[in-house]
Amino acid sequence: MIQAIVTDIEGTTTDIRFVHQVLFPYARERLTPFLRAHQQDDDITALLVDLRREIAQPDADIETLITVLHGFMDEDRKSTVLKAIQGIIWRTGYLQADFRGHVYPEVAQQLADWHQQGLKLYVYSSGSVAAQKLLFGYSDAGDLCPLFSGYFDTHVGAKRDVSAYQKIANQLGIAPQALLFLSDIRQELDAAQLAGWHTCQLIRDLPDNDSAHPQVNRFDQIVLSLFTE
């Protein structure tokens, strides 16, 4: 029996276009002036130290680091440092109501129903935990954060790595066969399945005919009783 559901965000709870056409450009436009202005802030200083370590350039100056981060954005690299900095920039956007976090129309109600049924709900996304909380806390369906029991990002590993799902199961103290992972990306679901999890693929746009995972178009099409040990 499923005890907990772990969901991806981009393409799963949230339209990928919101991420790529709203969030990413917002951060890209503000990245350079933000880092120049805040490079001495304690949290930013720590992130820049991590970035220098990531690129193996311990003496890189701020302009070099800005160039590196723009390169990361160009290639959509899942850099933990980049995601953290983006999240800090997005916080201003949410607080100023420049945008609201998009969730598909049925998502909020289905999450609330599962929560009411006693299921534990978690998020696992390549975006930072801080960014995840902002998206759901300032969503166009209201504050959804009370529905979630926890959040995971790339600190536990990449989403296509089996070990990441093993770590999450261990941290939750829940047997893998009692966990359901929701994502639109087949390779992420493959990794979760290899870790012993149940999986369900959200098909919001183009079909994925190469996938062997159960598929639905909406959260309210997910029938939990079909996922048995």
Curated annotation (Swiss-Prot):
GO biological process: L-methionine salvage from methylthioadenosine
Xref: Gene3D superfamilies: 1.10.720.60, HAD superfamily/HAD-like (3.40.50.1000)
Cofactor(s) the record lists: Mg(2+)
This protein's UniProt keywords: Amino-acid biosynthesis, Hydrolase, Magnesium, Metal-binding, Methionine biosynthesis
MF annotations from Gene Ontology: 2,3-diketo-5-methylthiopentyl-1-phosphate enolase activity; 2-hydroxy-3-keto-5-methylthiopentenyl-1-phosphate phosphatase activity; acireductone synthase activity; magnesium ion binding
Catalytic activity: 5-methylsulfanyl-2,3-dioxopentyl phosphate + H2O = 1,2-dihydroxy-5-(methylsulfanyl)pent-1-en-3-one + phosphate
Cofactor descriptive note: Binds 1 Mg(2+) ion per subunit.
UniProt keyword Hydrolase present: yes
Keyword set includes Amino-acid biosynthesis: yes
Alphabetical list of HAMAP family matching this protein: Salvage_MtnC (MF_01681)
Subunit structure: Monomer.
Role: Bifunctional enzyme that catalyzes the enolization of 2,3-diketo-5-methylthiopentyl-1-phosphate (DK-MTP-1-P) into the intermediate 2-hydroxy-3-keto-5-methylthiopentenyl-1-phosphate (HK-MTPenyl-1-P), which is then dephosphorylated to form the acireductone 1,2-dihydroxy-3-keto-5-methylthiopentene (DHK-MTPene).
Family: Belongs to the HAD-like hydrolase superfamily. MasA/MtnC family.
Record's protein name: Enolase-phosphatase E1
Originating organism: Yersinia pseudotuberculosis serotype IB (strain PB1/+)
